Amino acid sequence: MNNKNKITHTFQSEVKELLHLMIHSLYSNKEIFLRELISNASDAIEKIRFEKLYSLKKYRENLYTPKIKISIKKDEKKIIISDNGIGMTYKEVIKNLGTIAKSGTKSFLNKIQNIEKKEKNDFIGQFGVGFYSSFIVSNSVSVYTRHAKEKKNIGTLWISEGKGKYSVEKISKEEHGTIVELSLKSSEKEFLEIWKIKNIIKKYSDHISIPIEIENYDEKTKTISWEKINKAQALWTINKNNITKKKYQDFYKYLTNDSEKPLLWSHNKVEGTQEYINLLYIPKKATWDIWHQENKHGLKLYVKHVFIMDEATQFLPNYLRFVKGIIDSQDLPLNISREILQDSSITHILRKSLTKRILNILNNLSENNIKKYQKFWNVFGIIIKEGIAEDSENKTILSNLLRFSSIKKGNIEQTLSLNEYIKNMKKNQKKIYFITSDSYKSALNSPNLEIFKENDIDVLILSEKIDEWMMNYLTEFNNIKFQSVSKLDDTIDSLLLKKNVSNEKNTFNEFIEKTKKILKNKVKDVKITYRLKNTPAIVLTDTNDMSTQMAKIFSAAGQPIPKIKYILEINPLHPLIKKIEKIKNEKDFSNWIKIIFDQSILSEKGSLENPHKFIQRINNFFIS
């Protein structure tokens, strides 16, 4: 070491701010400094691997064994991380360690951007930022480095306490690569324990493809040995043809802490503009917190086999939050801490691709393994329904995944697909009919279904809270429109078998006009209908008005509800209506009409604005 060569520099102002931020607030988990340094060492080795491919005269495969080594010096309170990667020149040290985001990786990629080889995307990150995390646990950091293209013994030493200045000097270093020496703070003694370092490496860097070795010193024999800590090959990087079913299942359990086997999984390697590997699992059961909006649900993110974060939500839409697994990107951009993904175009591409992959997997399952898909739907169907509103781009395939109960199915289990419904439609049926209600039983007994049952027309039954909201976005399927049986539908008459119907429309004109005058602004309209059999009247909402179920959803959420004016449809063939039609006393006629209207409202909404008045009218008829 020649002190005459030592030159002191001041950090770039942004670096000073970064150091202060990192040391005092940025990283909540101090141990990730080791992850960052190992990641940087891995980057440096990947770079020299590239040089071996394109400068074969200088670097020979059989003369180079990549390695990352870690030594702990308890007495000196030091951790030393070394690699035999590409290293840095004197100028690169000043450029990369004195400024932000100029680690050499970005410049290196710019240099090779015209090379038509996939290896050019084989480097990650911004070295400088991660390197600064060393100061979270260190009083001082020393970096010894020599670039692989420099002559032997021409190296550089960089030293800083992270307080605004750093020194650089030329030194003699025989091997290319970098040694990072951390002088730990007195409060960070835990990182001097070998078991602690091993656990951190297994947690964050177990899947680094380069062997990571730790130094063991035997006090008795006074000998040093090196122990490999990481597996050095991630499961998802292995050819899927060489992975057993049990290995996939065991990895899922390790990944999720789920005691059960997954329902299914998908393992793919994608090469092209973006290169990444994904290993995705669909569980058999939902997690306890799947409805907790404050909890994040996402994939484990790796970049070049380096663990970056849990619950990376950027890669899947919220309605696929039940999916577990990993994504391992070769060139994904990261932000300053590596813990929050940049909202980049690459992220959007990966999200789009992964979403389509999962939906296609589910669609294939629904077509080829109905029993297994039904198990999936019974657990996660209600979450898939969210996608209809959230993901217009994939609405078609999402619609294929939907399952319903119906009046013909005769049970609450949702097993009917829309394709099956359409296949069984009547010849003259032009719409897909559905009903929404608070419960399956309530929907099944709705008077709105009477004429459909009589005419053997199936109706989808939707009784989950999300259904009404979903149907506002699901307006058609395969060019066939959906029609709520609780809304006005002037085309329904073409489906009905009208028996014993003469000229009621003409003879009931006076009845209709009198009813309109009695109900006044309580109704939007009063009409004759033949869709009823055992019920005297029903109320419907107009085509573009808010439905009763949607109003209930708004009310439950504390949202203001617009005044709903119903359309009263009267069954002229019902005995009670015929009896009322003959009443001459205007007061009695009026009371009967109000009772019929309240009954219809009660049947539709399940409640009345003034139930006491309704009961009073009923009682008056009992005693009259």
UniProtKB/Swiss-Prot annotation:
Disulfide bonds: none annotated. Transmembrane segments: none annotated. Keywords: ATP-binding, Chaperone, Cytoplasm, Nucleotide-binding, Stress response. One of its GO terms (molecular function) is ATP hydrolysis activity. Residues 339-552 are annotated as: B. It comes from the Bacteria. Pfam families: HATPase_c_3 (PF13589), HSP90 (PF00183). Residues 553-624 are annotated as: C. InterPro entries: HATPase_C_sf (IPR036890), Heat_shock_protein_90_CS (IPR019805), HSP90_C (IPR037196), Hsp90_fam (IPR001404), Hsp90_N (IPR020575), Ribosomal_Su5_D2-typ_SF (IPR020568). Residues 1-338 are annotated as: A. One of its GO terms (cellular component) is cytoplasm. It is found in: Cytoplasm. Belongs to the heat shock protein 90 family. Homodimer. Molecular chaperone. Has ATPase activity. NCBIfam families: PRK05218.1. This is Chaperone protein HtpG. It comes from Buchnera aphidicola subsp. Cinara cedri (strain Cc). The gene is htpG.
